[in-house]
Curated annotation (Swiss-Prot):
Compartments in which it is found: Cell inner membrane
Lipid bilayer topology: Single-pass type II membrane protein
Broad class of where this protein is predominantly found: membrane
Family designation: Belongs to the SafA family.
Phylogenetic classification of the source organism: Bacteria, Pseudomonadati, Pseudomonadota, Gammaproteobacteria, Enterobacterales
Cellular component, GO, one term: plasma membrane
Role this protein plays: Connects the signal transduction between the two-component systems EvgS/EvgA and PhoQ/PhoP, by directly interacting with PhoQ and thus activating the PhoQ/PhoP system, in response to acid stress conditions.
Induction comment from the UniProt entry of this chain: By acid stress, via the EvgS/EvgA system.
Cytoplasmic side: 1-18
Periplasmic side, ranges: 40-65
Spans through the membrane: 19-39
Protein name: Two-component-system connector protein SafA
Annotated organism of origin: Escherichia coli O6:H1 (strain CFT073 / ATCC 700928 / UPEC)
Keywords assigned: Cell inner membrane, Cell membrane, Membrane, Signal-anchor, Stress response, Transmembrane, Transmembrane helix
Length: 65
């Protein structure tokens, strides 16, 4: 009976760690997206077009190599 209780506690701890790691990942992704959209908002439309054009050229050149 004691072994079952210990096993259940270990399982609960593993589940807790897994849930906490998922929460941390979601929070980090959310903060990253907020930072990206904030930077895009500050750059403006003309800067975004230039960045998109440069990025497109970089991707095309990388694929051709």
């Amino acid at each position: 009976m004691h072994a079952t209780t210990v096993k259940n506690k270990i399982t609960q701890r593993d589940n807790y760690k897994e849930i906490m790691s998922v929460i941390v990942v979601v929070l980090l992704l959310t903060l990253t997206l907020i930072a990206i959209f904030s930077a895009i908002d500050q750059l403006g439309i003309s800067e975004m077009g230039r960045i998109a054009r440069d990025l497109t050229h970089f991707i095309i050149n990388s694929l051709q190599d």
